[in-house]
Amino acid sequence: MARSIWKGPFVDGYLIKKVQKLMESGKSEMIKTWSRRSTILPIFVGFTFSVHNGNKFIPVSVNEEMVGRKLGEFAPTRTFYGHGADKKVKRK
């Protein structure tokens, strides 16, 4: 079920403050965050976020196509190593 429109998108307050500070200073630093639940806003475009995946921080460069999605969608938490190979290898 989607979030109610009257509430608006959820973004942690400190993320907006950090982005605004970087916009004022003109620097382009990586913003380190644990907030995977925050929605990507249009003011985030062009910035790089380090999103925590439970083990390490994954760099996520934000572009226009990502607006409206969550930061956590771009930092996978699980690694797939593939299914086990068949032990009965048939050779002819």
From Swiss-Prot:
Transmembrane segments: none annotated. The keyword RNA-binding applies. Pfam families: Ribosomal_S19 (PF00203). Keywords: Ribonucleoprotein, Ribosomal protein, RNA-binding, rRNA-binding. The keyword RNA-binding applies. GO terms for molecular function: rRNA binding; structural constituent of ribosome. One of its GO terms (cellular component) is small ribosomal subunit. One of its GO terms (biological process) is translation. Belongs to the universal ribosomal protein uS19 family. Protein S19 forms a complex with S13 that binds strongly to the 16S ribosomal RNA. HAMAP family: Ribosomal_uS19. This is Small ribosomal subunit protein uS19. It comes from Rickettsia canadensis (strain McKiel). The gene is rpsS.
